[in-house]
């Protein structure tokens, strides 16, 4: 059974109009083994088509896959700042790459009539050294959902409370969203 078949079957068997959280893993929507950003458009389109046929509210969190992991690993971004120009440049590149992937996801949703707005993780969230989210933009998600749109967000490089940087994973974001919204269903 494919991820999309499972998602589709579960959405259509549920007639409520409650919030559903979806995590699109980076290795699912990109070729994570690639050293260059490479997306898997078929799966993104499949999910977009499924959502377009639903009247439910959605928050989608996606991973970075090949749009962030290779450069983050190469420059040891999750180990904190090392003061080098190369690492600062790599942080900016990683952020640009995950925003590019977010735009691809948003664009594919838009093509099938699913209106989305993004909550840019590196602009709105901060974590501590144990990956607990300190600043969470619940009001941003609430505004998007109140407009009848799908809220999108993603794993990204964020500031931490020690004036350093860390990678905030999509899984951690999804866990926080689950704690805040207590959704009827969450799909990984």
Feature map (PLM): residue ranges:
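Short acidic, glycine/serine/threonine-rich loops at helix termini
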Residues: 32-34, 70-74, 129-131, 162-165
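Glycine-rich loop at the start of a catalytic domain that most often binds anionic cofactors/ligands
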Residues: 65-80
């Amino acid at each position: 059974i494919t991820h999309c078949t499972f998602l589709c079957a579960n959405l259509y068997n549920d007639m409520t109009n409650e919030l559903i959280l979806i995590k699109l893993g980076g290795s699912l929507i990109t070729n994570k083994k690639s050293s260059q950003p490479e997306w898997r458009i078929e799966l993104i389109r499949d999910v977009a088509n499924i959502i377009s046929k639903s009247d439910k509210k959605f928050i989608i969190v996606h991973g970075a896959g090949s749009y962030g992991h290779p450069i983050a690993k190469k420059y040891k971004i999750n180990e904190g700042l090392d003061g080098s120009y190369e690492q600062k440049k790599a942080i900016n590149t990683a952020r640009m790459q995950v925003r590019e992937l977010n735009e691809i996801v948003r664009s594919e949703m838009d093509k099938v009539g699913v209106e989305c707005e993004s909550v840019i993780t590196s602009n709105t969230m901060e974590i501590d050294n144990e990956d607990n989210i300190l600043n969470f933009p619940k009001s941003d998600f609430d505004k998007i959902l109140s407009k009848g749109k799908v809220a999108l967000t993603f794993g990204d490089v964020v500031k931490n409370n020690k004036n350093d940087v860390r990678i905030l994973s999509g899984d951690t974001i999804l866990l926080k969203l689950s704690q805040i919204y207590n959704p009827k269903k969450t799909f990984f």
